[in-house]
């Protein structure tokens, strides 16, 4: 399908070049299918192609008209089933198993379809991303309220302790955790992981360079940034002179005599970035049809050295960001393991008094949120490895609405929310609430 | 009947609310703490005893006495 829309798009470009104006999407579709498939399309088929599948450049508005999908039902119906099962209206183990698999499968399908809407259909425009980020913020605010209610119950109970627990907090005779042991390690783990993830995000969105005091690397970075600016401002005609200057810095002046050998070596390196280039640069212009001009020139005439510079830079950058993602995941897993250890060896239990109830309610829900955050970080790690956040997709500024890193940004917000809740938990339960 | 003075627990600013549960509990703890302090001599602890008896339901006192006997009462002071 993607190839079809590219052709459709190119047909439009051709039309702009030849006649100076765009043909309508439907006319273009008709034309292409006539040419390529050899038979004309019926009206309703054209309507289906142009209305149901709506690439960005074929719409007259920036919003995403979502397609019909079974995912929301597959997620919410099992939720209803869980409730009925909990109250004993329905009790069937097979039904529960089916509901659970439908719930998880629906979530997976929903996530993947949103990612595909963004990557292949190019539906995530500025406005759509703003809506997504706003939705995430609303969700986080609702989560804050959720935790606020539990903190309220904690303070209600602990500020004026009942006579049954000896009018003291923590309850008389109960052994509770010291704030200096595992909880402190957990605090360090969560805060460190948040900082590291933020660092990865700043590198991803190019707010921060990949640091290394190496002239070659700095030269490559600078060259790359300049190249990006040149391509993004569409003044790519004189890149070759610019690359010559960079080449001197990068390989030394004596290498000029060995240009041919160097270029042959670099052709090999550039092969690695070719796939990336084919995907990304097409997508860039595919995504920004307003950049198309009558003298539109496909950006395929990069020099070999430019490819090499980009390859080296991208490899280093990917490695650095990947390290940060892995480290964050590791921190999350160790945190969960520590919490599991603490739960397993707890001197109180959930049903032996008010302290245990509140402790497990608060830390348990927080632990569940850490688990969800870890899953989100896992998703963005996979997306990063697969290449969803490639450089041209991501953009070069901290503009969450203008780049393709919205998923990363939302995960980051969520992770920081989990961090902050933990800080309150640590201060209130482990520190203030201990002896 | 004429000579008998009826007296309830005096006002205590630590417990200004209508709910006097904790006031009762504090008097129970104070009474037995006082007895413990004077090595079983309860003659100086009558204020606490009177307040306790006028504030606390009898069932609570007997329950707490049982807890105290079984060493389960949630306080160090009794």
Curated annotation (Swiss-Prot), chain A:
Q: What is this protein called?
A: Cytochrome c oxidase subunit 3
Name the reaction it catalyses: 4 Fe(II)-[cytochrome c] + O2 + 8 H(+)(in) = 4 Fe(III)-[cytochrome c] + 2 H2O + 4 H(+)(out)
Q: How does it assemble?
A: Component of the cytochrome c oxidase (complex IV, CIV), a multisubunit enzyme composed of a catalytic core of 3 subunits and several supernumerary subunits. The complex exists as a monomer or a dimer and forms supercomplexes (SCs) in the inner mitochondrial membrane with ubiquinol-cytochrome c oxidoreductase (cytochrome b-c1 complex, complex III, CIII).
**Keyword tags:** Membrane, Mitochondrion, Mitochondrion inner membrane, Translocase, Transmembrane, Transmembrane helix
Which SUPFAM superfamilies does its entry note? Cytochrome c oxidase subunit III-like
One GO cellular component from the entry? mitochondrial inner membrane
Instruction: Tell me what topology the record assigns in the membrane.
Output: Multi-pass membrane protein
Tell me where the transmembrane regions lie: 70-90, 96-116, 132-152, 176-196, 325-345, 360-380, 412-432
Q: What is its EC number?
A: 7.1.1.9
Keyword presence, Magnesium:
no
- Which protein family is it in? Belongs to the cytochrome c oxidase subunit 3 family.
For this chain, one GO molecular function annotation is: cytochrome-c oxidase activity
> Where is the protein found, in the record's own terms?
Mitochondrion inner membrane
Kindly list the biological process annotations in GO that this record carries. Answer: mitochondrial electron transport, cytochrome c to oxygen
Which top-level group of life is the source organism from? Eukaryota
> Which top EC class is named for this enzyme in its record?
translocase
Q: Please name one Pfam family that this protein belongs to.
A: COX3
UniProtKB/Swiss-Prot annotation, chain B:
Family matches, as InterPro entries: COX6B-like (IPR048280), CX6/COA6-like_sf (IPR036549), Cyt_c_oxidase_su6B (IPR003213)
Motif (Cx9C motif) positions are: 24-34
**Annotated GO CC locations:** mitochondrial inner membrane; mitochondrion; respiratory chain complex IV
GO terms under biological process: oxidative phosphorylation
Going by the entry's taxonomy, the superkingdom of the source organism is recorded as: Eukaryota
Q: Which residues form the CHCH domain?
A: 21-64
Q: Specify the pathway.
A: Energy metabolism; oxidative phosphorylation
Report the Pfam families cross-referenced here: COX6B (PF02297)
Chief location category: mitochondrion
Question: Which keywords does the record carry?
Answer: Disulfide bond, Membrane, Mitochondrion, Mitochondrion inner membrane
Where found?
A: Mitochondrion inner membrane
Topology in the lipid bilayer is annotated as: Peripheral membrane protein
Instruction: Give me the disulphide-bonded residues.
Output: 24-56, 34-45
Positions of short motif Cx10C motif: 45-56
What does it do?
Answer: Component of the cytochrome c oxidase, the last enzyme in the mitochondrial electron transport chain which drives oxidative phosphorylation. The respiratory chain contains 3 multisubunit complexes succinate dehydrogenase (complex II, CII), ubiquinol-cytochrome c oxidoreductase (cytochrome b-c1 complex, complex III, CIII) and cytochrome c oxidase (complex IV, CIV), that cooperate to transfer electrons derived from NADH and succinate to molecular oxygen, creating an electrochemical gradient over the inner membrane that drives transmembrane transport and the ATP synthase.
**Family listed:** Belongs to the cytochrome c oxidase subunit 6B family.
Can you state the subunit structure given in the record? Component of the cytochrome c oxidase (complex IV, CIV), a multisubunit enzyme composed of a catalytic core of 3 subunits and several supernumerary subunits. The complex exists as a monomer or a dimer and forms supercomplexes (SCs) in the inner mitochondrial membrane with ubiquinol-cytochrome c oxidoreductase (cytochrome b-c1 complex, complex III, CIII).
The name on file for this protein is Probable cytochrome c oxidase subunit 6B
